[in-house]
Design a protein with these regions (language model features):
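Periplasmic-binding protein-like
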Residues: 37, 113-121, 190-232, 250-255
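Alpha-to-beta junction loops
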Residues: 68-69, 85-94, 136-137, 166, ...
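Short helix-initiation/N-cap motifs at beta->coil->alpha
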Residues: 56, 72-82, 125, 162-176, ...
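Ligand-binding cleft/hinge of the Venus flytrap
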Residues: 45, 59-68, 146-164, 193-197, ...
Length: 255
C-alpha cells in the first residue's frame, strides 16, 4: 500500500472514530428542566419525593422521541425564569402560559395544553363571574396569568388582590376564609378543588383560551425545533392522548 493510501485510510479511520464520538456525546446529552413541583396535576412531588405529573410525562415523552435525556429540577415559580436566564437550566416546563409579554424575553414550543382561568370559591358563595369579585379579596399566584387577569380587572395596586408563591397556598387561604376567591389555571384549580368538598369552581366565559408552552432562551431555535418535532411526534403516535387521559381521566378533545 502506498504512503498516500495509508494516510487516506488513517484519515478515514480517525474521521469515523471522531464521528462516532460526537454521536455518542450528542446522544448522551442531558438537558436540565426546571419545573415548580407545587402545581398538581402538572408537576408535584409524590410520596416518594419524585417529581411527577402531566408536564413531566410530556417532556419525558418528547425527550424519548428526540433521543435526549433530562434531569428535572424542582424550582420555585418565583425563580424559575431567573434559572433559565442564568443558564442553570436549559428549559422550563411548568404550566407557563404563552403570551406576548413573555415572548419578548423567551421563545416557546408550540402549545402542549389548552387552558383558561378558573375561579374557586366556597361552596355557598354566590359569585358567578369575575365581575362579581369586585370589592372581594382574591388570591392569585404572584406574576401568574391569574395575577394579570385580576390586575387588569381590579387594578394592579388593589389591596384586595393577595399574591402568593404557589397554588396550594392560594387554595389554603381560600379554604381558611382569608380570601373570598382564588383564580388560577383551570387544570390545577379543578384538581385542588376536587380534593376539598367545601369549595367549588366558577367558569367565566369571558376568560380566553390560553396555551401552555415549553420555555427556552430567546434565540435557541435548535432546542425549540427539537421540542416542536418531539411534541408533534407524541401527538401523532397517540402518546399525548394516553398521558392526557392518565392525568385528567378523560379523552383528549382539544388541539
Amino acid at each position: 500500500m502506498s504512503i498516500s493510501r495509508r494516510i487516506a485510510t488513517l484519515g478515514l479511520g480517525l474521521a469515523a472514530s471522531f464521528g462516532v464520538s460526537l454521536a455518542a456525546q450528542a446522544q448522551a446529552r442531558e438537558l436540565t428542566v426546571a419545573s415548580s413541583a407545587t402545581y398538581a396535576p402538572f408537576a408535584f412531588e409524590n410520596k416518594d419525593k419524585q417529581i411527577v405529573g402531566f408536564d413531566i410525562d410530556i417532556i419525558n415523552a418528547i425527550a424519548k422521541q428526540q433521543n435526549f435525556k433530562i434531569k428535572v429540577v424542582n424550582t420555585p415559580w418565583s425563580g424559575i425564569f431567573a434559572a433559565l436566564n442564568n443558564g442553570d437550566v436549559d428549559l422550563v416546563i411548568s404550566g407557563v402560559t404563552i403570551n406576548d409579554k413573555r415572548r419578548q424575553s423567551y421563545d416557546f414550543s408550540a402549545p402542549y395544553f389548552a387552558a383558561h382561568q378558573l375561579i374557586a370559591v366556597a361552596k355557598g358563595s354566590t359569585v358567578a363571574s369575575l365581575k362579581d369579585l369586585t370589592g372581594k379579596k382574591i388570591a392569585v399566584v404572584n406574576a401568574s396569568t391569574a395575577d394579570d387577569v385580576a390586575s387588569r380587572e381590579f387594578g394592579k395596586t388593589n389591596a384586595n388582590i393577595r399574591r402568593f408563591e404557589s397554588t396550594p397556598l392560594i387554595i389554603s387561604e381560600l379554604a381558611g376564609g382569608g380570601v373570598d376567591a382564588a383564580i388560577g389555571d383551570n387544570g390545577v384549580i379543578a384538581y385542588r378543588v376536587s380534593q376539598n368538598a367545601a369549595l367549588k369552581t366558577v367558569e367565566d366565559p369571558s376568560f380566553p383560551e390560553e396555551g401552555f408552552g415549553i420555555v427556552v432562551k430567546k434565540g435557541d431555535k435548535a432546542l425549540q425545533d427539537k421540542l416542536n418535532a418531539g411534541l408533534a411526534a407524541v401527538r401523532a403516535d397517540g402518546s399525548y392522548g394516553e398521558i392526557y387521559k392518565k392525568w385528567f381521566a378523560k379523552e383528549y378533545k382539544g388541539r
